[in-house]
Regions:
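Short hydrophobic alpha-helical runs that function as membrane-insertion/retention elements
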Residues: 75-78, 133-135
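C-terminal lobe/tail of nucleotide-utilizing enzymes
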Residues: 97-145
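ATP-dependent carboxylate-amine ligase catalytic core
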Residues: 1-71, 79-102, 106, 115-119
Length: 145
């Protein structure tokens, strides 16, 4: 389900228009046209997914994975590392291999406790065949209650 409030937040942050790409409400052609129109003059387009990558209104129908596949958008996984370390390896492996037509380019971790913690996460990425792109440290000052 798209979050219609997010587009306003995106516009404030990016300084340009933001739209929803809704696989339930829009045809594939309309999604492609919207994406082409709103990214035609952009150097970079950040496309935020909703819920989990493969969650849609009917299994994967309307999911972020479906939109990514349709538009050939590379995927950066954002992984909560709060209570895990090397155990993310099979999770990453599964996301990379569940649909071979998708382009999972890497992972960013949040809630990382230390550089040592991140070293386990980097090793998990390496063993799962997913690039570790970085992390956001655990920081009470920026947590949302």
């Amino acid at each position: 389900m798209p979050d219609y409030i997010d587009t306003r937040h995106h516009k404030m942050a990016a300084g340009c228009a933001s739209v929803n790409l809704d696989g339930f409400m829009m045809s594939e052609g309309h999604i492609k046209d919207l994406y082409a129109r709103y990214t035609s003059n952009a150097d970079v387009a950040v496309t935020e997914g909703v819920m989990g990558l493969f969650d849609g209104y009917d299994a994967m129908r309307g999911s972020s994975a479906e939109i990514s596949g349709l538009l050939r958008i590379p995927i950066v996984l954002v992984v909560n590392a709060k209570s895990t370390a090397y155990s993310v390896a099979p999770l990453l492996y599964g996301f990379r291999n569940f649909r071979k037509d998708l382009n999972v380019v890497g992972a960013v971790f949040n809630f990382v406790a230390s550089e040592s913690h991140y070293s386990f996460l980097r090793q998990a990425c390496e063993d799962a065949g997913v690039e570790a792109l970085g992390y956001l440290p655990k920081c009470a000052d920026v947590e949302i209650p």
